[in-house]
Amino acid sequence: MVNRQPPTLDLLSKSPGAHPPRTQVPGSAGVENRKSKDFLFLQLRDLPYFRAFLRAVESSYYQDLPLPVPVYDVGCGDGHFASLTFDQKIDVGLDPWHGPIHEAKKHGAYRFLVEAEGAKSPFPSEYFSSGFSNSVLEHIPHIDAVLAETARVLKKNAPFYFCVPNTRYLSELSISRFLGPGYTDWFRKISRVHHADEPDIWEERLARAGFEMKQYWHYFSPSSMRVLEWGHYFGVPSVVTRLLTGKWIMAPTHWNLWLTKKYVSRYASPEPVENGTFTFYIAGKK
């Protein structure tokens, strides 16, 4: 039976919209997460706002989830997300992209970084005690192979957390109402999303790979999704800044970002919503 709400103290919430409290695994050493952090500002000072406010929501979820060590990050990218989300280093970050994973060294969020395909992990079976993949799996064409390999390197009953867009990521696009499916297909391509699926599809994928889906909840409302959509266009100046200076934000200060933060904060709620455009999953290795 899959629980469709975020975890509460007993991990079985019956209160819709309840934000998960902090949990621990008795007797298991794990990664200590950042508490009482302003994740929205921390993300805004480094990223374009349309990426920052979604990542801030996702950072908040990990504060409530146990991550017994060693921890495996599938698709760590440039390491920015982990550096802001966790107080202690993640044991291993794996990514196939040469540029981002070498940039991850600068953030210092990992004990070890491995440049490799997620479907060909160099680690022995049942090596890791927990794993996560933050907004990565939707970009992987060979998703079944990556999930199966992730299951192989996780210990029995190890938790695996991931978040991905669902079907409403595409169906709630505002410009599609005027330009039709051609725009939807184009947006899917520029955002490199191969899988925008509902929980039943993910449950089947997980089962084939050797996981059991434990929980999920939808988040990021349709209105938030449309702010993200338009941010791709309003964020063009940030792209120019990045190309010229290597930074997304020239003045990452409170006074420079307060108006942006004030605007996006109303769309950056971590509360689960039934028609959310993204879904957070908790799975367990069988």
Give, region by region, the residue ranges found by the protein language model.
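A C-terminal cap/extension of S-adenosyl-L-methionine-dependent methyltransferases
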Residues: 15, 177, 215-286
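A short glycine-rich, Lys/Arg-flanked "PGG" loop and its adjoining helix->strand segment in the class I
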Residues: 144-159
